[in-house]
Amino acid sequence: PGQVKLIFQPAEEGAPPGEEGGAELMVKEGVLKNPDVDAIFGLHVWSGLYAGQVYLRPEGIMAAVNEFRIDLKGVQTHGSTPWTGKDPIVTAAQIVNSLQTIVSRSLPLTEAGAVVTIGSIHGGVRSNIIPEDLYMLGTIRTLDNGMKATVLKRLEEIVYNVAKSNNIEANITYLVSYPITFNDPYLYEEILPTLERVNGKKNVHLMKAITGAEDFSYFQEKVPGTYFFIGGQKTDVDLSTVAPHHTPDFYVDDSAISTGIRSMVGLTLDYIFNN
């Protein structure tokens, strides 16, 4: 005998700016209490894998994410006399290039992966005016907490020192932040036979960690958990032609639903009867 709690979570992709949401808020509001949760399981469909296939790994399976905003403030001037102002655009270019040295020159990449990406730059309105203000938006993905600390430290060193060298004011604001999605190794070993039994051993695969992120990690910070992926593509489709997630042509075949149901029901029943 045991109890099963189903969590219906909003805002998996993050709450609107300035608001709380998703798994972090649910944990704060007591979703893992009354009754207390002993273990948690989650899954994610993947369009680039064949339906009927299950992929997982022990320990880190998805990266931590730290999204950030960099604000630069200079002195506006005419583009024909740049020496009369302070140029945030040139400074931004230097910062973007320098940030790419964090991964290539400051991290032991044979141990774990990391990504630093600037995805958006906003500044200026005319070709012949150097603007006063500029801001950039970026994301950091790390698969190791030590690397995460190093990347954040180097980010601040680079931004503030490059800005200072150009007489520019700089400020970093941290936005969305998710921990590493970490599969408890003991729970992983306990549930692996279940997944192999209900799906067929040949259909369950050990995967490499990926640099996507998932706020399911907030649940795993509180209780042992395992997160895994199921395929969602027809077996007669060339996977190299499949549209990725978050694109207009994204498609998942309905046959994936049975894999998900079979896996979650099997995990739930086996965990309850074995514990």
Predicted regions located by residue number:
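Metal-dependent amide/peptide-bond hydrolase catalytic core
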Residues: A93-N275
